[in-house]
Regions:
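Short amphipathic alpha-helical segment within the helicase RecA-like ATPase core
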Residues: 1-226
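A generic structural signal for tightly packed, nonpolar segments enriched in small/aliphatic residues
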Residues: 28, 38-39, 75, 160-424
């Protein structure tokens, strides 16, 4: 109906574009009409078919946002009607921020104002709420991306800790505590500390608490792996592509992005963010294959490969999460290359000890377009972690994503937990 209304007021320009074959209206098709009227310099049309998937609907919104941003216009209007769901309105504002992001800060867009024009009775007040939520998520996403893109000589564990502190300084709803190496050693976090032994950069455990609930409800704990640069340690990675190992802290960056978004939207929940931050380097002080270390939980671990280090920092952070008596714990980590072989680059691998939590994450993934696929935590895989010299080994042969999840599950017996392998 909104398209018909616009077409009528523009003397049938949309009908003419379709009749001339310039615009098909098919899913994710697009057309830009220049000088559609005296006051409209650009009319951007994006095709949306009935029954489009969530992924396609996100793509078409991002396509519209991209066309707006590259049109060199200062003011734009986005027409919405009762065919738009609330989450799609959130995606509009999120997409503008996402697409306009530039690490160098040299975005060429001249857009200064985007108004949503509501037709056919869509609630303006609800639209404003959705827009604000989308902007908060968009800024959180861009913070995550920016931290990931920052070179490892700048984005060190200390740098991440300072970012977390500055976020809490700006928002009274967030409390940040930084555990230094001496404090972690006193707590028995020798697994976490073993990864950063050889680095000149001190390891940190960043603890962020968002208390938005008016009641004493149990918090949700998010644990994000942050290896700010991963050489593999003594089990050295090949040189090709090693520059991308600065992205091995994106689990931790995701947690920071979530906390940033929470500080803006003021949700009525409690969330704890735990970010173990280390740098994995080789030197005379490095942990060696064959070494046995003791985790905070008391479980001993034989290190068979120092490049399987993410699980070594996560296991102590997962043990530390116990003190918050969490309702759920979700860890987010670029943990295994094996997940790319299993699922490619379109899906997050998930393992969980709770079908309740797994179903929540699958549902959220389907509704947001950021899908997950559950992998099994069967005892046959867990048995591959047997060690002759410790309680378990840090690698377990085939099915590396699953055995990594089995490793982490040993430290999550006291709560409902899920692991998200975001390496893909």
């Amino acid at each position: 109906k909104s398209v018909q209304h616009i077409d009528k007021n523009l003397d049938g320009v949309i009908t003419k574009m379709i009749q001339d074959g310039d615009f098909s209206g098919k899913n994710i098709s697009t057309c830009v009409v220049r000088n559609a009227s005296k006051n409209i310099k650009r009319l951007i049309l994006v095709g949306k078919e009935e029954g489009s998937s969530v992924q396609d609907r996100i793509k078409l919104i991002e396509l519209g946002a991209s066309n707006i941003l590259k049109s060199y216009i200062t003011n734009a209007h986005w027409v919405i009607d009762d065919n738009y769901e609330d989450w799609e309105i959130e995606i509009i504002s999120r997409s503008i921020l996402k697409i306009n992001y530039s690490f160098k800060g040299n975005s060429k867009s001249s857009l200064s104002k985007l108004d949503l024009v509501c037709l056919n009775g869509h609630s303006l007040s609800n639209t404003e709420t959705c827009t604000q939520y989308g902007e908060a998520v968009g800024r959180g996403m861009n913070l995550c991306r920016h931290l990931g893109n920052t070179p490892a000589n700048i984005c060190t564990p200390t740098f991440l800790a300072e970012k977390a502190k500055s976020l809490s300084d700006e928002n009274t709803c967030i409390k940040t505590t930084i555990l230094e190496e001496s404090e972690m050693r006193d707590l028995g976090m020798l697994s976490l500390l073993s990864v950063g032994n050889a680095s000149a950069q001190p390891s940190k455990l960043i603890v962020m608490e968002y208390n938005g609930s008016k009641t004493m409800q149990q918090p949700i704990a998010l644990v994000g792996k942050a290896v700010t640069f991963d050489t593999g340690g003594i089990s050295l990675k090949p040189g090709r592509g090693m520059d991308e190992m600065k992205f091995d802290m994106c689990g931790g960056a995701s947690v920071l992005g979530v906390m940033s978004a929470l500080s803006e939207v003021a949700l009525d929940i409690n969330v704890v963010g735990l970010i173990p931050a280390v740098e994995n380097m080789p030197s005379g002080n490095a942990t060696k294959p064959g070494d046995v270390i003791k985790s905070m939980s008391g479980i001993t671990i034989e290190i068979l490969n120092t490049d399987a280090e993410g699980r070594l920092i996560l296991c102590d952070a997962l043990t530390y999460a116990n003190r918050f008596k969490p309702k759920y714990v979700v860890d987010i980590a670029t943990l295994t290359g094996a997940v790319i072989g299993a699922l490619g680059k379109f899906t997050t691998g998930m393992l969980s000890n709770s079908e309740e939590l797994a179903e929540i994450l699958v549902s959220c993934g389907n509704s947001s377009g950021d899908r997950v696929w559950q992998l099994p935590l069967w005892k046959e895989y867990d048995q591959q972690l047997k060690s002759n010299f410790a309680d378990l080994a840090n690698i377990g042969g085939e099915a590396g994503t699953i055995t990594a999840g089995c490793f982490l599950s040993r430290f999550t017996k006291d709560y409902k937990w899920a692991h998200l392998d975001i390496a893909g």
